[in-house]
């Protein structure tokens, strides 16, 4: 049986935890009555073994077995580093 592993990309919104961070994934959904496209955000907790991701980074994550009560995703790679102004 070949299950495709889900991977998604999002922006790091919090990196204050040790070996963990939170990302926000944005998607656009159509409003049922107005027909206008609105943005919806999903927040996920991600396991980061080496503390690679920083606040504002664009990262790719994949689904894995539960690491803790809230973490079922792990870091694949940092797609784009955040620019510090």
UniProtKB/Swiss-Prot annotation:
Statement: the UniProt record of this protein carries the keyword Protease: no
Gene name, Swiss-Prot/TrEMBL: rpsQ
GO cellular component: cytosolic small ribosomal subunit
Its job: One of the primary rRNA binding proteins, it binds specifically to the 5'-end of 16S ribosomal RNA.
GO MF annotations, alphabetized: rRNA binding; structural constituent of ribosome
InterPro entries (UniProt xref): NA-bd_OB-fold (IPR012340), Ribosomal_uS17 (IPR000266), Ribosomal_uS17_bact/chlr (IPR019984), Ribosomal_uS17_CS (IPR019979)
Family: Belongs to the universal ribosomal protein uS17 family.
Binding partners and assembly: Part of the 30S ribosomal subunit.
Native species: Actinobacillus succinogenes (strain ATCC 55618 / DSM 22257 / CCUG 43843 / 130Z)
SUPFAM superfamilies linked: Nucleic acid-binding proteins
Family annotation (NCBIfam families): PRK05610.1, uS17_bact
Taxonomic superkingdom: Bacteria
An annotated GO BP: translation
Listed name of the protein: Small ribosomal subunit protein uS17
